[in-house]
Every structure is written in C-alpha cells, then in structure tokens.
Amino acid sequence: MALTWNSIISAEKNKAYYQSMSEKIDAQRSLGKSIFPKEDHIFTAFDLTPFNDVKVVILGQDPYHGEGQAHGLSFSVLPGVKIPPSLRNMYKELAEDIPGFTIPEHGYLKTWAEQGVLLLNTVLTVEEAKAHSHAKFGWETFTDAIIKKINDDMEGVIFLLWGAHAQKKGANIDTSRHFILQAPHPSPLSAHRGFFGCKHFSQTNELLRQQNLSEINWGSVTSS
C-alpha cells in the first residue's frame, strides 16, 4: 500500500504525546488566545505536497506569529501580506542564482509546494506575538517522525537546511540516500554570513537533473 501523509499523520495523532499537545493547544484556544495558523491550515504543507511527490524539503522553524501571516507553509505568507524579511532575502538569492528570476510582489509559495517542495516548519503552531511559544508542546516529535518517514521510505530527496536549528533537525538524515545543502539562515541577522551566494536553488535543480527528475520552476511564484 502506498504511503500517504494521511496514514502517517493519523498514526502520530494516536500517540500520547500528540494527544497531550492537542489538549494544550485546545486549552489555549478556549482561553481566547490567538493561535496561528488557523486550525484548517496547520497541515497545508502536506495537503499541497503529497508524500510520494516530495523532491525537496525546506525546513523552517515555527510559524510566523503575526495576524494573517502563517498559513501552514514554511517561509510563505498569503497574497496581500507583506513579504517577511527572510523570504525577501530568499528572493534576493534567487534573483542572483536563477537566470530570469523576477522578484514577485507577494510571498505566497504555493506553486513551489505543488511541484514537490515540502515547506515544513519544525513546529506547526504558535501563539500570537510569542515566537517559539509552542516549541516544547510536542511538534518537534511530530516533525521528527515526518522527516524520518521521508528519510526511510524515499530516495534522493534534497534537504535545504538553513541555520543551526534546521541543521540540528536534519542530523539523522542518511546522506548516502539523500542530499543535504546547508547554509546560514536567510534572516537579516545571518544572511550575509553565507546564505547570500549559497546557490542552493540552482544546486537543487542540478541534483534533480542528475536523478532524471523535473526541475523546480522557482520562478513560478512570479506568475502565480
């Protein structure tokens, strides 16, 4: 039977850690706290990128914690929302790295997800205006299980690990079966330390070509 995110996520939801985490999040919601993203957006990354379609994983940390920003894809924001600084820097690198890439006026990365780029945060919820507020709730265990499934059941996936948090998260990826590209985080605090000039987007496409897989059209965001 082909693996699906539905079966993988259902198995995790039955575990004690997940049920405990759900109770904590529900308790916060019932106190009137704003939790991002909205409940029906928590698993957007999995909805847009089916398990067997995953070619690339871009690991983020926790969701954006401003009103209307987070929608379940790492680094991405919905159309009409101001482009966050880290994504702005990703676009700058793309413009240098990919011939013809035009920086879009929005930060909506859905077209990447639809091409097999799993835009995965390591923590999937956050309280409004409180970065990392759900970091210890259990999401790290959940996303460890997600990464392990990709590691164990797929071949040739390209992991883009930017910054110490993502690199630590990817420490157990089998590099004899998968590819890891590492750089500093694209945030304004660290982008100049080696994210700019890393050429990860063109390198990703080169690695896909070597496997006879279709490249990611990174510029698809401009026309979307």
Swiss-Prot record:
GO cellular component: cytoplasm
SUPFAM superfamilies found in the cross-reference section: Uracil-DNA glycosylase-like
Superkingdom of origin: Bacteria
EC number(s) recorded for this UniProt protein: 3.2.2.27
GO molecular function: uracil DNA N-glycosylase activity
InterPro entries referenced in this protein's UniProt entry, alphabetically: UDG_fam1 (IPR002043), Ura-DNA_Glyclase_AS (IPR018085), Uracil-DNA_glycosylase-like (IPR005122), Uracil-DNA_glycosylase-like_sf (IPR036895)
Catalytic activity: Hydrolyzes single-stranded DNA or mismatched double-stranded DNA and polynucleotides, releasing free uracil
Cellular localisation: Cytoplasm
Active-site residue numbers: D62 (proton acceptor)
Disulfide bonds: none
A Pfam family annotated for this UniProt entry: UDG
Keyword Lipid biosynthesis belongs to the record: no
Keyword tags: Cytoplasm, DNA damage, DNA repair, Hydrolase
CDD domains named in the record: UDG-F1-like
Main localization, broad class: cytoplasm
GO biological process, one term: base-excision repair, AP site formation via deaminated base removal
Similarity comment: Belongs to the uracil-DNA glycosylase (UDG) superfamily. UNG family.
NCBIfam families in alphabetical order: PRK05254.1-1 (NF003588), PRK05254.1-2 (NF003589), PRK05254.1-4 (NF003591), PRK05254.1-5 (NF003592), ung (TIGR00628)
Function comment: Excises uracil residues from the DNA which can arise as a result of misincorporation of dUMP residues by DNA polymerase or due to deamination of cytosine.
Name of the protein: Uracil-DNA glycosylase
The organism of origin for this protein: Aliivibrio fischeri (strain MJ11)
